[in-house]
Amino acid sequence: DVKERSAVVRFKVKGEDAYILAWTTTPWTLPSNVALCVNPDEDYVKVTSKGYTYYMAAALVDTVLGEGAEVLEHYQGKDLEFKEYEPLFPYAEKRIGNKKAYYVVCDTYVTLTDGTGVVHIAPAFGEDDSKVGHRYDLPFVQLVNEKGEMTEETPWAGTFCKKADMAVLQALEDKDLLFDAPLFEHSYPHCWRCDTPLIYYARETWFIRMTAVKEDLIRNNNTINWIPESIGKGRFGDW
């Protein structure tokens, strides 16, 4: 388990003086954001607090906003589906293409255990995000290269993405879009050899239909003089 800065971010709603309040434990993925996700079956509210108007989960208002918040309207998550918002950053513009982006989607994987009941979606950097992205045909935006560094479209080109967290948070703060950046303790994968943080990273992959070549593999395996013999009959011969 590690303690890291999470981000509670204000996403400006299109055509309204209001924000969708969303949470993420990976601030470095925010430049690649293309959607926000709510749970279709949970209760959400439009609420005012300290001069701002927010959309968020009803159950988390007191935890996130504290006392004094005034609820204006009630919704089910599914009522917010397709509500549009303005992008946080312009860096993904060329990668969006003609696909629709920057709107609210729904999925039951969103929980109310932590955060705001709204999570940001970057399909290139998570299994749940990827599934939601495919279902809604969201654009694939990956502003991190295969070395794990932020790409040239961003101001942090060449920086290892995890080390870009604080710079991304500062950029949001400068835009008055960062509501909070609390420390959050969670399990995070690290390399077992060098203890470097790992990232979820979508990439093209080859898959081989082994049933089509199984008999050839067994026949060729039987021509090999394996020492010890059990390796050939076991690990390489057991199909």
PLM feature segments, named:
Residues 1-31, 84, 109, 113-239:
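Residue patterns forming the tRNA-binding/recognition surfaces of aminoacyl-tRNA synthetases
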Residues 32-146:
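Catalytic alpha/beta core of large soluble enzyme barrels
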